[in-house]
Amino acid sequence: MEMNPLLVCATVAIVFATTTIIRILFSSSSLPQMKWPSGPRKLPIIGNLHQLGDDVLHVALAKLAKVHGSVMTIWIGSWRPVIVISDIEKAWEVLVNKSADYGARDMPEITKIASASWHTISTSDAGSFWQNVRKGLQSGAMGPLNVAAQNQYQERDMKRLIKAMSDEAANNNGIVKPLDHIKKNTVRLLTRLIFGQAFDDNKFIESMHYEIEDIIRISGYARLAEAFYYAKYLPSHKKAEREAFLVKCRVEELVRPLLSSKPPTNSYLYFLLSQNFEEEVIIFCIFELYLLGVDSTSSTTTWALAYLIREQGAQEKLYQDIRMTLGDVDLVKIEDVNKLKYLQGVVKETMRMKPIAPLAIPHKTAKETTLMGTKVAKGTRIMVNLYALHHNQNIWPDPYKFMPERFLEGETGTAYNKAMEQSFLPFSAGMRICAGMDLGKLQFAFALANLVNAFKWSCVEEGKLPDMGEELSFVLLMKTPLEARIAGRNV
């Protein structure tokens, strides 16, 4: 006997609605018992999702904060309340002054698959494991002496990158897609920090680049399950879980053979092996560096290039800053990057306009604490909107305008005041500030200086400016990857 398809669909819908209502009734009693900050009115089942509109999440939340206050409760679906902070004073209370209280993590369930069940720096709570691994990374592989030892290799890689872009432009009517070139350069740097300077395997680099792309694609499915509890049982989410598991297996297959090597003592692998961690933990602590380091540097660099294409005056100022400071050089050396004042302004302004992680990595209270004197229960989810802090018009004049001069002192710039300094948090702040912050800033500045020194950047078509639309994944990506026309500088 055949069943009526409409009857089947109706039955499924009724079951879904019934179980969702049951979930709402029972989950409300399990929420942290506290007085939640006010926020926009929520609807059954969907919570505040209907008020997030067509904007990317950080922009939508910034708009809601202007109406409902700088500390508000947002319901992601009907079962996940999140306190969203869009004010610098409250942000500092959470991130800095009470960083231990707010130092736990709130990660999507699907991320357990490729993080050794949340045993990595970014996904684990702020306990002894987290402290040990973070310290080992920062004092060893990312220590100042080890990073400085990479300079000659990075400068060699940059020459290769410039040559590769020149070749691409020559074969494509002057047009290039810079993102992949920058990504692969970053993979090479991280590979040397992880496995040692002698490691140079192009096949490994290509394979790791592919796995990073794949896990970022899959991560988008996590949002549906975060909003609707039973969405994790849908075929699309189950498919995402299977694909994430396949990435996990491929990453293990890629990295596992390297664990039996004898890495140099200043490498990240040497430190991880010395701690007698389980193999899975070692592999995914390594994968984490690629996952968070590659796209953050490459995406921020392409954002900067897009702004400089749109603002040709700023691009010319940067080029003249290089020429006036360093002369007619073929390559800007890493040791010279900090001499370039306008470059530093462009770097900071890009990170202000397009923070790498505009909502940081979500926090959760590790114990009962307070916010502005009001009780906040253990297990409460907290989100700090760094984008909102960076676009507060009371602190940043013309906040939506790209102005590197705002970070400069003197005749051509505005005074960089204390309020701006406290509100500029592209890498978050406090004990959970990005572990690779210093390296990330240096690589961004080094890449940008050399790309502007080597090429003049312009629109692919006259008058057709780069699309500045955003896509939020692990980091803030360009919705439409940058394409540009380049011409070699006559130096």
Curated annotation (Swiss-Prot):
It holds the Pfam family p450. The keyword Calcium does not apply. Its cofactor is heme. The keyword Iron applies. It is found in: Endoplasmic reticulum membrane; Microsome membrane. It is an enzyme of class 1 (oxidoreductase). The chain crosses the membrane at residues 6-26. It catalyses: (S)-tetrahydrocolumbamine + reduced [NADPH--hemoprotein reductase] + O2 = (S)-canadine + oxidized [NADPH--hemoprotein reductase] + 2 H2O + H(+). It is a single-pass membrane protein. Keywords: Endoplasmic reticulum, Heme, Iron, Membrane, Metal-binding, Microsome, Monooxygenase, Oxidoreductase, Transmembrane, Transmembrane helix. Heme binds at C434. GO terms for molecular function: (S)-canadine synthase activity; heme binding; iron ion binding; monooxygenase activity. InterPro entries: Cyt_P450, Cyt_P450_CS, Cyt_P450_E_grp-I, Cyt_P450_sf. One of its GO terms (cellular component) is intracellular membrane-bounded organelle. Expressed at low levels in roots. Gene3D superfamilies: Cytochrome P450. Its EC number is 1.14.19.68. One of its GO terms (biological process) is isoquinoline alkaloid biosynthetic process. PANTHER family: CYTOCHROME P450 98A9 (PTHR47944), OS09G0441700 PROTEIN (PTHR47944:SF4). Involved in the last but one step of the biosynthesis of berberine, an antimicrobial benzylisoquinoline alkaloid. Converts (S)-tetrahydrocolumbamine (THC) to (S)-tetrahydroberberine (THB) also called (S)-canadine. Belongs to the cytochrome P450 family. This is (S)-canadine synthase. It comes from Coptis japonica.
